[in-house]
Regions:
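Glycine-rich phosphate/pyrophosphate-binding loop regions near the starts of catalytic domains
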Residues: 28-188
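Hydrophobic face of alpha-helices
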Residues: 23, 121-124, 195
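Residue-level signature of catalytic and energy-coupling elements of molecular machines
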Residues: 15, 66, 179, 252, ...
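N-terminal amphipathic/basic leader segments beginning at the initiator methionine
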Residues: 2-37
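Glycine-/charge-enriched secondary-structure boundary and capping motifs
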Residues: 2-12, 119-137, 150-157, 207-211, ...
């Protein structure tokens, strides 16, 4: 079928032809995420996915949506767009696995000042890679050109995921008790939260060239490279643990750091007792704290501090959980703390 073209619409700033070109360029990446449950291809009004309920007594769907925040500004300055999509997927799927669910499908939304097909394809390349890592299918998306609302070179990125979990296996903290062990799954860096403060610490908006410097603390990486490290996707190792261990709670450490996110999975009357000396904090966070003269409390209340996800498990199953994590892509997972009587997070 011949593609349509509108000179009037193009004159208003919306290039339909660029949209077609973007879709053609991204098809090869989207194809990597498809499986036998996907029905149809790109171009429909909705993404179709056949739900296989085999093995589920009472399947429950869980949805999540998120974006990448102002980490996008770092990607734009560095002109590197092929990993920011991984961040978008990670922010969504890491949230829904906190209920014990397996992500099934993902959709993305890109708003841009001008549709530059090669750039859009690079963004979607990252989204597709994130979907592969999370073992879910990229079944649809939208690229919206916003002339007059956004500068031509800028874009925003958001995503949406749906997962499934058996109702009887939805994670519950009802049996959480003092003595349970908190396990840490290391992050790859700042992940996708706190970048407004990061930009202020390094004065990035006024001095973007700082991203091309290589502070000694970063072991040869530039600041921009360290900050753009993609958010880790924890789906596969966590699902493996859930198969064999009585996990009592999972927290994805995002905006708000330890103090906001760990309590979200705690039972009332329980607190997370963590020795600060046991937190394996990467050099990047130490550089940020020193450069910005940020208090320790604010660091733990804003950033993940090197811990991207925590699992709470019975003490007698902690070693087994660590063995599973170590064998499934999380070789550096470690004991972070214990559950005690109280409320919230106790960093001592």
């Amino acid at each position: 079928m011949e593609k349509s073209y509108s000179e009037s619409y193009a004159a208003a700033g919306v290039d339909i032809t660029a949209g077609y070109r973007s879709v053609e360029l991204m098809k090869q990446y989207v194809a990597r995420t498809m499986n036998e449950h996907c029905i149809g291809g790109l171009g429909g009004f909705g993404g179709l996915f056949e739900l296989d309920c085999t093995g589920y007594k009472h399947p429950v769907l869980i949805s999540g949506t998120d974006g990448v925040g102002t980490k996008l500004k770092i990607a734009m300055i560095m002109d590197k767009h092929d990993t920011i999509g991984i961040d978008c997927v990670a922010m969504c799927v890491n949230d829904v696995i906190c209920a014990g669910s397996k992500p099934l499908v993902f959709l993305d939304y890109i708003a841009c000042g001008r549709n530059i097909p090669e750039k859009i394809a690079e963004i979607v390349k990252g989204v597709a890679e994130g979907c592969v890592q999370a073992d879910c299918s990229l079944v649809g998306g939208e690229t919206a050109e916003h002339p007059g609302m956004m500068p031509e070179e800028e874009y925003d990125l958001a995503g949406f995921t749906v997962g499934v979990v058996d109702k009887e296996k939805i994670l519950s903290n009802e049996t959480m008790a003092a003595g349970d062990v908190i396990l840490a799954l290391p992050s790859t860096g700042v992940h996708s939260n706190g970048f407004s403060l990061v930009r202020k610490i390094f004065d990035i908006d006024a001095n973007p060239d700082v991203l091309h410097t290589a502070p000694a603390e970063l072991g040869g990486k530039t600041l921009g490279e360290a900050l753009l490290a993609p958010t880790k996707i924890y789906v596969k190792p966590v699902l493996k643990v859930l198969e064999e261990v009585d996990v009592k709670g999972i927290s994805h450490i995002t905006g708000g750091g330890f103090y906001e996110n760990i309590p979200r999975s705690l039972k009332k009357g329980c607190c997370a007792r963590i020795n600060k000396a046991d937190v394996r904090t990467p050099a990047l966070f130490q550089l940020m704290q020193k450069t910005g003269n940020i208090s320790e409390h604010d660091m733990f209340n804003t950033f993940n501090m090197g811990v991207g996800m925590v699992l709470t498990v019975p003490a007698e199953q902690a070693d087994k959980a660590l063995d599973i994590l170590h064998a499934n892509g999380e070789p550096e997972a470690y004991r972070l703390g214990v559950i005690a009587e109280g409320e919230g997070v106790e960093l001592c």
